[in-house]
Each structure stands twice: as structure tokens, then as C-alpha cells.
Amino acid sequence: GGPNERKDYHYDESEEFFYQVEGDIVVKIMDNDTPVDIPIREGEVFLLPPRVPHSPQRGSNTVGLVIERKRAEDEKDGLIWYCEKCHHKLYEEYFCLDNIETQLQTVFHHFYGSTEHRTCTQCGTVMAQP
């Protein structure tokens, strides 16, 4: 459920199935280093192909279901951040996901705790901390 205003993009080796139960959302994807917004309206489904960086943006009072297949033991998830101005990749980190609550917070700390990671090497824009 929403709201969700994260700036990271999730990387998954397999497809993800979205079913939007209440309200409308936008799933931001990166397609060849170009941001694309995919609206998913209430009652709609969407199958995200594998290996597409994506960032679901949920407003208040939205409820959705996301189904992912079980990962192989050595399969990694990733979080990627892109410059908000020029879309150059800022930082990426990959990990075998065992505990979503603790592991995501650790990766967020690695990124947001480092001005170097948040600074675009292409245009110099610095992503603000949340």
C-alpha cells in the first residue's frame, strides 16, 4: 500500500506481476537509460519483464499486489539510483535477499550516507537525502 516515494530502482532477474487493487499508480522504469512511466490503474494488471530497473510510485490510499517468483539461492536483487537531472547511473548494489527489512535499509544507508554515491559524475547534480 501507499504512499511510496522512493527514488531507487529495483532490479530483479525474473518478471514481476503487478495487480492494482485500489487506486492508480505509476511504475517508473529505465529503458536504455531513458526513464519511462507506466501507469497501472485500479483493476489492471501488468507483467514487468525480467532485468528491467523499476520503481513503483504509490500515492495515498492505494493498494496493490506484486508477485515475484522464488529466487534461486545464488540469485541477486539490486537497487539502482539514477541522476534526477540527466539519468546517468549514480550507484548500484546487488545482494542475495534474505531479509527485506534489514537488507534494504543497509543499502539505503550505503547510498544516502555517501555524498560521493549521490553525486552525478556526468552533470554534478547531488541527489538529496530523504
Regions found by a protein language model. Give the residues of each.
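Jelly-roll (double-stranded beta-helix
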Residues: 2-19, 24-45, 53-130
